[in-house]
Curated annotation (Swiss-Prot):
<keyword id="KW-0288">FMN</keyword>
<dbReference type="InterPro" id="IPR004507">
    <property type="entry name" value="UbiX-like"/>
</dbReference>
<dbReference type="GO" id="GO:0016831">
    <property type="term" value="F:carboxy-lyase activity"/>
</dbReference>
<comment type="similarity">
    <text>Belongs to the UbiX/PAD1 family.</text>
</comment>
<keyword id="KW-0637">Prenyltransferase</keyword>
<keyword id="KW-0808">Transferase</keyword>
<protein>
    <recommendedName>
        <fullName>Flavin prenyltransferase UbiX</fullName>
        <ecNumber>2.5.1.129</ecNumber>
    </recommendedName>
</protein>
<dbReference type="GO" id="GO:0106141">
    <property type="term" value="F:flavin prenyltransferase activity"/>
</dbReference>
<dbReference type="Pfam" id="PF02441">
    <property type="entry name" value="Flavoprotein"/>
</dbReference>
<feature type="binding site">
    <location>
        <begin position="9"/>
        <end position="11"/>
    </location>
    <ligand>
        <name>FMN</name>
    </ligand>
</feature>
<feature type="binding site">
    <location>
        <position position="114"/>
    </location>
    <ligand>
        <name>FMN</name>
    </ligand>
</feature>
<feature type="binding site">
    <location>
        <position position="144"/>
    </location>
    <ligand>
        <name>dimethylallyl phosphate</name>
    </ligand>
</feature>
<keyword id="KW-0285">Flavoprotein</keyword>
<dbReference type="InterPro" id="IPR003382">
    <property type="entry name" value="Flavoprotein"/>
</dbReference>
<feature type="binding site">
    <location>
        <position position="160"/>
    </location>
    <ligand>
        <name>dimethylallyl phosphate</name>
    </ligand>
</feature>
<feature type="binding site">
    <location>
        <position position="35"/>
    </location>
    <ligand>
        <name>FMN</name>
    </ligand>
</feature>
<feature type="binding site">
    <location>
        <begin position="79"/>
        <end position="82"/>
    </location>
    <ligand>
        <name>FMN</name>
    </ligand>
</feature>
């Protein structure tokens, strides 16, 4: 699959970084995008320097057009600013434009939200995304898996994203499986 992974300025950049790494490891063609704030937050939270494939202001990038073939887009984490822009058709940078293209071309768009608590405007914007064909996925790890580390909790969320993309993995123990499975 050809997948766009975008990292915005919300806390939780590890989700986008880890998703990108796992998709590459599994042999998928991945395009990495990041907002300027997303790059700063990733450095602050993880100590990692991320280098996007395109600048967030490059609206001449191939992925800004519906004629460019890709299968899906995941924004992880997705800030409420980015969610609001996408929900209201405001394509002010490459991330929001690529998301707009994803929706208009009826491709899979997954927005991993981490904000809490939510206000009415956030929820209304999520409803607009769902009505437009996108998927809202809260970064809410399960605890039946008995996570022992932050990595265990991150892997659960990444695994759920891979499930939505139809990609086979073994990142977390599924409900009903024994711990030694």
């Amino acid at each position: 699959m050809k997948i766009i992974v975008a990292i915005t300025g919300a806390s939780g950049s590890i989700y986008g970084i880890k998703l990108y790494e796992i998709l590459k490891k599994l042999g998928h063609d991945v395009i990495l995008l990041a907002s300027k704030t997303g790059i700063k937050v990733a450095k602050y939270e993880t100590g990692m320097e991320i280098t996007p494939d395109f600048d967030e202001d490059d609206l001449f990038a191939p992925i800004a057009s519906g004629s460019y073939p890709f299968d899906a887009m995941v924004i992880a984490p997705c800030s409420m600013k980015t969610l609001g822009a996408i929900a209201n058709g405001f394509s002010y940078n490459l991330i929001t434009r690529a998301a707009d293209v994803t929706l208009k071309e009826r491709r899979k768009l997954i927005l991993l939200i981490r904000e809490t608590p939510l206000n009415l405007v956030h929820v209304q914007n999520m409803l607009k995304i769902i009505q437009a064909g996108g998927i809202i996925m809260p970064a809410s790890p399960a605890f039946y898996t008995k996570p022992k580390t932050i990595d265990d909790m991150v892997n659960f969320i990444i695994g759920k994203i891979l499930d939505l993309l139809g990609i086979t993995h073994n990142l977390y123990r599924r409900w009903g499986m024994r711990e030694d499975d």
